[in-house]
A protein has these predicted regions:
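Non-ligating segments of multi-cofactor redox enzymes
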Residues: 1-173
Length: 173
């Protein structure tokens, strides 16, 4: 008889491959003024203060010198720290009317254990916006109107069944 650990592991390997194929990992920090500002201002920023300011430790710098978010361990709390330290105002509270990232999350029905009949609400528990809804005890779905793209659901999913698609940053033309 297979153990519970083996059961969960059986979902991980195919999901990792699918996740990598589905979306590039380029989610920008909150309060962004637009992709062009990242490309023109961030590479010349020497302090990279946005990285040090992030208590969740999810901001990292790409090879091109621009910041991106990594949801593998945590999500964004929209604490404003990165925007408050950005001297070039690429990240600024003035840039956004709402707390929302340029990502829309989705749950893979094939990889999600709740969709396979296992009681699991790992994604719902950390969702501060109550954007993950369950049909009964199973079948979670993400309400796109409520989801801010914070990434906590992705960080907490034991089978890595949550992925995202990149959205255009508001303000970009």
């Amino acid at each position: 008889m297979a153990s519970r650990r083996d059961f969960f592991k059986s979902f991980v390997k195919p999901t990792k491959q699918t996740t990598e194929e589905l979306s590039p990992r380029l989610v920008r920090p909150p309060y962004a003024s637009g992709e062009s500002a990242f490309q023109s201002e961030c590479p010349s920023c020497e302090s990279k203060a946005c990285v040090a300011s992030c208590d969740e430790k999810i901001i990292f710098i790409l090879d091109d010198g621009t910041p991106s978010l990594d949801f593998s361990k945590n999500g964004c709390t929209f604490c404003d720290a990165c925007a408050n330290v950005c001297k070039a105002d690429v990240l600024s509270l003035e840039n956004s009317k709402e707390e929302k990232l340029n990502a829309m999350f989705r749950i893979s029905i094939e990889a999600c254990v709740a969709h396979q009949g296992v009681i699991c609400n790992s994604c719902k528990e950390p969702c501060i916006d109550d954007a993950i809804l369950f049909n009964g005890m199973f079948n979670p779905v993400i309400d796109e109107n409520r989801c801010t793209g914070c990434g906590f659901c992705m960080a907490r999913c034991p089978t890595q069944a949550i992925d995202f698609r990149i959205l255009e940053i508001e303000g970009e033309v």
